[in-house]
């Protein structure tokens, strides 16, 4: 017979008989490869019957405890879950119509893959937000190579941007589409970082005001300037564009100042959309955010648009369409998982399960924080409570008057 066991012994190894039988002098301890180890002392365990369901029971002789040798397949299920989420496969096409897959992956939806802290300084970072509905948006920051961070919020505001940017080292340049609250957050968190407003979004603002088939001469001139804005490649062309834009503002100044009376008696600009586009461009030129990428101090070509992160948003929307029907929290977690798998150093599944928090962990954290806040509010401090001695006397009160 063939021995498929690893042997450890105390004593002298005597001889091998024809390569089949081992004679051991002294005490012999044969440990099978499939033997379970004791969770307390680490010694090998022996088989000790089976449970009512037919599973093998194991017993440790020194500790005299019994246990079941369970195999944790959660990491394998997480890899399967991520492979499905990042693909275009439908659950209906999986074996069994996806019922077994949903049962295996149900606990994995409890995980929250949070973004890591990025201490590496990058030359350029793109920021944008993908809206998942009227009450949720995921803010994303990335480089041309990988995703750096993500943050879920109710809307794009300065507090949400600060929460995202505080975990990332300030870059040399950040390219944005001009989202609400970003400028304020950047001034506080990344004060030394220069901002480049996406020129394509500036063009879209012009196109929205003038339309693609303008009828008015002022709209035609502004739309032509918007098309030229996308092809500015050096400082000389930028100065020429700014000069042409200023000429347009001077020529149509009186036209843009025309006002019309509303039915309620108030006044409004007759060409309000053109006025808004003009004010937006004036602000970008005045703050120097339109042609930051053409600064001669850069030692490498800098991007003028957010095309890189817009491509990421397109892939995220495609993923949500492929797996449409998920509720809001799962759509949010799906975006989180995509960003995490496309980050610089994603961890293996086993490490993710050991480090990433779950819904229960977040609920406990919020509960503990609320309890601490209540205790702090209940316990009085100096100057926020009435002292007993201020309203009472320690000596007895004598009512001796008539």
Can you describe what each PLM-predicted range is?
Residues 38-41, 60:
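Short cysteine-rich clusters marking metal-coordination/redox-active sites
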Residues 30-33, 55, 59, 65-69, ...:
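RNase H-like nuclease fold core
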Residues 85-95:
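Short, charged amphipathic recognition helices of the HTH superfamily
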Residues 47-57:
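Short linker/helix segments within small regulatory modules
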Residues 1-36:
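A broadly conserved sequence feature marking short terminus-proximal activation segments
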Residues 43-46, 68:
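Short functional micro-motifs and their immediate structural scaffolds
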Residues 177-226:
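Conserved beta-strand -> loop -> alpha-helix junction used to position metal-binding or nucleic-acid-contacting
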Residues 57, 62-64, 68-75, 80-81, ...:
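Acidic/histidine-rich catalytic cores and adjacent linkers
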């Amino acid at each position: 017979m063939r021995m498929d066991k690893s042997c450890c012994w105390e004593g002298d190894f005597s001889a091998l008989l024809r390569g089949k039988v081992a004679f051991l002098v002294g005490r012999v301890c044969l440990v099978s490869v499939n033997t379970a180890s004791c969770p307390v002392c680490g010694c090998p365990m022996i088989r000790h019957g089976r449970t009512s369901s037919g599973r093998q029971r194991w017993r440790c002789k020194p500790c005299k405890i019994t246990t079941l040798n369970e195999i944790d397949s959660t990491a394998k299920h997480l890899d399967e879950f991520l492979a499905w989420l990042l693909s275009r496969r439908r659950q209906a096409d999986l074996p069994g119509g996806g019922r077994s897959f949903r049962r295996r992956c149900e606990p994995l939806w409890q995980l929250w893959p949070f973004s890591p802290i990025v201490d590496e300084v990058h030359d350029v970072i793109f920021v944008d937000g993908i809206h998942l509905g009227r009450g949720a948006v995921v803010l994303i920051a990335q480089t041309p190579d990988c995703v750096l961070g993500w943050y879920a919020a109710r809307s794009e505001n300065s507090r949400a941007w600060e929460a995202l940017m505080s975990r990332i080292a300030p870059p040399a340049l950040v390219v944005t589409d001009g989202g609400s609250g970003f400028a304020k957050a950047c001034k506080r968190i990344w004060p030394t970082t220069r901002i480049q407003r996406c020129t394509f979004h500036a063009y879209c603002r012009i196109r929205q005001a003038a339309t693609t088939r303008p009828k008015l001469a002022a709209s035609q001139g502004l739309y032509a300037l918007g098309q030229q804005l996308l092809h500015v490649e050096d400082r000389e062309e930028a100065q020429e564009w700014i000069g042409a834009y200023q000429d347009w503002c001077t020529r149509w100044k009186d036209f843009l100042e025309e006002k019309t009376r509303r039915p309620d008696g108030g006044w409004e600009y007759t060409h309000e959309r053109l006025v808004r586009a003009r004010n937006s461009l004036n602000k970008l030129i005045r703050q120097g955010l339109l042609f930051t990428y053409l600064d001669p101090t850069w030692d490498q070509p800098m991007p003028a648009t957010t095309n890189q992160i817009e491509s990421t948003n397109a892939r995220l929307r495609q993923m949500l369409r492929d797996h449409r029907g998920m509720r809001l929290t799962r759509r949010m977690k799906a975006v989180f998982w995509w960003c995490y798998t496309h980050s610089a150093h994603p961890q293996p599944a086993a490490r993710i399960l050991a480090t990433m928090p779950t819904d229960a962990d977040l609920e406990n954290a919020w509960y503990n924080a609320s309890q601490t806040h209540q205790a702090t509010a209940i316990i009085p401090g100096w100057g926020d409570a009435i002292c007993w001695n201020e309203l009472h006397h320690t000596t007895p009160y004598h009512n001796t008057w008539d």
